[in-house]
Amino acid sequence: METLALFDFDGTLIRGDSIVPYLCRAHAQGDASLGDLMAAATGYFLFRLHLRTAEEAKTRALQFRRRLSPARRDALDGGFAREYLLPRLYPAGKECLLAHAQAGRRVALVSASPDNYMRYVAAALGVDLICTRILPDGRADVNCSGQEKVRRLRAYVAQHAWTVDWQASYAYGDSRSDMPMLRLCGH
């Protein structure tokens, strides 16, 4: 029987949200224009007013990536993860994550953040990743937040044909959107 250790990312393992610094970095490197930043801000504003979905806001924020070559996207995404996100991990959070891995638990980042840069974070930490996928056409798939985190976790467990001891499993989060995942686990 497997036990899991599940970690939200933004606000739990790092301070704040990761997509805004990602967009700022893309702009600073010349990959995203000021117009792209304005489109992202507009998308976020419309989302907050409940006039757009989270998926639409993420798609709009990341639309500049469609103009980049695959190599340029990989360089931007990997560089952001290595040079910005990983150095900003809360030391106690990283220590906790690594301790769970050393204890033999299956460890996963479960995040609404997009996979284009989160995959580099997960790979560097040696953990699995369940997050919002960016489709080949640049659109964001279903936002991995709230009850969607639980749905994705159950699919992840079924895909691996694991039997999970949910009462002995751990979940870490910092917001209301993490509550369904937190309620799933005993710790």
Predicted feature descriptions by range:
Residues 13-16, 51, 67, 147-150:
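Electropositive phosphate-/nucleotide-binding environments in soluble metabolic enzymes
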Residues 56-92:
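Metal-dependent phosphoesterase signature
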Residues 1-49:
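Active-site neighborhood of HAD-like aspartate-dependent phosphohydrolases
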Residues 3, 31-32, 43, 49-52, ...:
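Conserved alpha/beta cores of soluble small-molecule-handling proteins
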Residues 48, 64, 68, 134:
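Active-site phosphate/ATP/adenylate-binding loop shared across adenylate-forming ligases
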Residues 21-22, 41, 60, 76, ...:
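A general alpha-helix detector
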